[in-house]
């Protein structure tokens, strides 16, 4: 039954890609009974020298307070510990709806007090740019983890690192099968059972290198991360799930980063 349902959906997906994906997503959301968040992942490529801290200062002093006032909480801001060498700052903003993703920025910029407070960033001239470039990825939360999670370490004011992984898939139907593996297949539940601490799982609906998904895990440190993955890899339920041929050849490329939170990150 599982394969028959997926093959039918895949046929629709091949004939009408946008409508097929929408139908699958809506069907899953109805089953979950919970409203899924949308995540905005912003990557700032920073200049060298004294201007490198302008983006951090803007989020710390202006953007996060304004977002919280607008009802957007648990905003994460991170530095890269292991990943590309160029200086970057990563921001994760959870939204209650896709409409919020589209409209929030304009609402903030229509507020004169907000623009004045963030003028150094928002109106930075070409001769003194706050960032070199900015990239965005928009994701929809998985049904089995519909909202961003605040890690235990943050709640207890303890150090933490984040492992960020993107899974690229060779086709649209393969991407849907991998998401199915995390949700209905039980992979997220195995993560949680074995002590891995998910922060978010998101299907990329707008961004580069699609089709793909993103997930973020929190750990105390590298030792805890390695230990956690060892427990996961030896779990009987994971061994059974990973051997299921229904989920074979769903991931064509994996990208991996390690982030550390800024002092003002809410995640």
Residue map of PLM features:
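Short boundary motifs at domain starts and secondary-structure transition points
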Residues: 28-34, 127, 151-158
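C-terminal functional regions that serve as terminal interaction/effector modules
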Residues: 35-37, 187, 191, 207-267
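Non-transmembrane alpha-helical segments in soluble domains
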Residues: 7, 102-106, 166, 179, ...
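Short, glycine- and small/hydrophobic-rich beta-strand elements in well-ordered beta-sheets
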Residues: 22-34, 64-90, 96, 186-214
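Surface-exposed interaction/gating patches
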Residues: 141-222
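Hydrophobic, ordered structural segments
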Residues: 45-54, 61-69, 74-153, 169, ...
């Amino acid at each position: 039954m599982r394969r028959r349902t997926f093959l039918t959906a895949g046929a629709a997906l091949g004939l009408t890609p946008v409508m097929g994906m929408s139908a699958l997503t809506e069907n899953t959301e109805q089953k979950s009974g919970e409203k899924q968040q949308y995540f905005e992942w912003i990557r700032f490529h920073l200049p060298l020298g004294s201007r490198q801290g302008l983006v951090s200062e803007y989020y710390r002093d202006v953007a996060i307070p304004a977002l919280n006032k607008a009802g957007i909480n648990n905003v994460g801001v991170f530095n890269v510990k292991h990943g590309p060498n160029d200086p970057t700052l990563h921001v994760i903003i959870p939204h209650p709806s896709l409409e919020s993703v589209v409209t929030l920025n304009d609402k903030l910029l229509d507020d004169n007090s907000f623009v004045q407070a963030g003028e150094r960033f928002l109106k930075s001239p070409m001769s003194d740019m706050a960032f070199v470039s900015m990239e965005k990825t928009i994701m929809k939360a998985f049904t089995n983890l519909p909202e961003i999670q605040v890690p235990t370490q943050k709640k207890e004011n303890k150090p933490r690192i984040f492992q960020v992984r993107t899974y690229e898939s060779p086709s649209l139907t393969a991407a849907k099968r991998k998401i199915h593996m995390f949700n209905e297949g039980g992979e997220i539940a195995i993560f949680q059972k074995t002590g891995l601490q998910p922060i978010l799982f998101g299907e990329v609906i707008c961004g580069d290198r699609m089709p793909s998904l993103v997930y973020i895990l929190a750990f105390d440190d590298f030792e805890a991360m390695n230990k956690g993955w060892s427990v996961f890899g030896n779990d009987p339920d994971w061994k059974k799930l990973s051997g299921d041929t229904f989920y074979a050849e769903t991931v064509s490329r994996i990208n991996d980063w390690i982030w550390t939170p800024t002092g003002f990150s809410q995640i």
